Amino acid sequence: MGLFEFLKKKEPPKPAAGPRPMLRPMGGGLPPHPEPKAENNFIIAILDSCRFDSFMTAAPKTMMKLGPVEKRYTYASWTAPSHYNLLTGLLPHTSPPNVYASEYYKEDFFNYNSRLGTKGIEFGKMVPTLWFPGLLRNTLGYSTHARVSLPVLNPKTGINRDFDSFTLMDHHNDMRAMLPTMKFDTARPSFYMLNIGETHYPYAKPNEDSSMWPRISGVNGVFKKMDEAVGPDGQLIKDQTQFFDHEKLEQLRARQIDAVRYLDDVFQELFDLVPKNTHIVITADHGELFGEMGYFGHGPIMHEKCFEVPYLEGKIR
């Protein structure tokens, strides 16, 4: 049984339907919020590219106030598909042996009842969209928001659906700038997805001089420069940049660890900001390679370190 079959409820046969209703045009207004059916605000804080052992080496004291840290595994090896997957409601998994995927999905979804502070969530209403922000907003009455650091997740992409606000931050590495934009309404719970870029290459804190960073493009940058990468003869012009040596790779690994330690102070500010009934998940969208088996980064890589991520959740008060 796949995810779609699990969520879909079997119903008795219905009489033949009339003409299909016109769908709401893309980019049109969202429907009104229903009355809220949950008590907890819910935040998913995604440390982009943060591999599990980097997090554990950093030993962030503030973040660990949420609860024990688990090693989990992401469903994808790079940012865009991993965030799409997170927004279906599937969090990084534990890779349990001798368990059917359908049984794992059921338990994962059932746990949202306690995360959101409600009972009997009607997951069947996620069919056919399979979109968790839609369930949160249009069934449970949440206000839904996203703050993203990486341009590959910008508001023009397909994941900007059923969000009341969706903002690409001015800088890719400044979680602290997200905090003043986060508002919590006493009339209804809020959902925030935070894509946090300090742990993404080049693992930079916001006060660093960007002119000193080496430049390696992600998918967004590749698209921007693709026309320049094709010569007049129609052949692809390959970049001759030399691969990082061991010393540089170790420096980059240390930078990611340092970024986690820096973010720990910012998370204290987040914890001070959120209201009492706020359930927070801290995790990553994928891991990162620092020279293992000749790999660097993430994306077209099949290696366990590209999928191992930290996972912790709970209420701060």
Model-assigned labels for residue ranges:
Residues 1-317:
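Catalytic domains that recognize anionic headgroups
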